[in-house]
Design a protein with these regions (language model features):
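Amphipathic alpha-helical interface elements
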Residues: 1-142
Length: 142
């Protein structure tokens, strides 16, 4: 038997489409899932970790993040964005009434990663742009 294929492979085109949602909860949850999936693809390629192991519920997001951070692959503003995107997701996933001020602060801290933008962009627009630019930066590691 060969390797079990992941349920889906992340793509920038799909990410751009799926982030065009009106539901804020969905926006933050889906954005983080895409980032986590690309982290898994990096771990699979760079460290030869089987996708079955990465899909196991015992392997937490923080473990994936730490492996990439401590190996030196995840650094600078990409690392910062990955952490902030996960923090935002956690605030929505683990609280009935998330602290909107804390979420706004996290979004404000996100970096555009070389993408041009306007100052009039909404916080949700900034989140979308930053998730896509972070995904693109991570994809270059493959």
């Amino acid at each position: 038997m060969g390797k079990k294929a992941p349920m889906w492979a992340p793509s920038k085109k799909e990410l751009e489409k799926i982030l065009e949602v009106d539901n804020v909860h969905e926006l933050f949850l889906v954005g983080q899932v895409y980032i986590e999936r690309i982290l898994e693809k990096i771990l699979e390629k760079k460290f030869n970790i089987p996708i079955e192991a990465l899909d196991d519920p015992m392997i937490m997001w923080s473990q994936k993040y730490l492996i990439l951070e401590k190996s030196g692959l995840l650094k600078g503003n990409v690392k910062k964005n990955v952490r902030l995107i996960n923090n935002i997701r956690n605030r929505y996933a683990h609280r009935l009434k998330p602290d909107e001020k804390a979420i706004e602060n996290n979004i404000r801290e996100l970096e555009y990663l070389g993408v041009s933008h306007t100052n009039s962009i909404t916080k949700f627009g900034k989140y979308r742009v930053c998730v896509i630019s972070t995904f693109t930066a991570l994809e270059k590691m493959l």
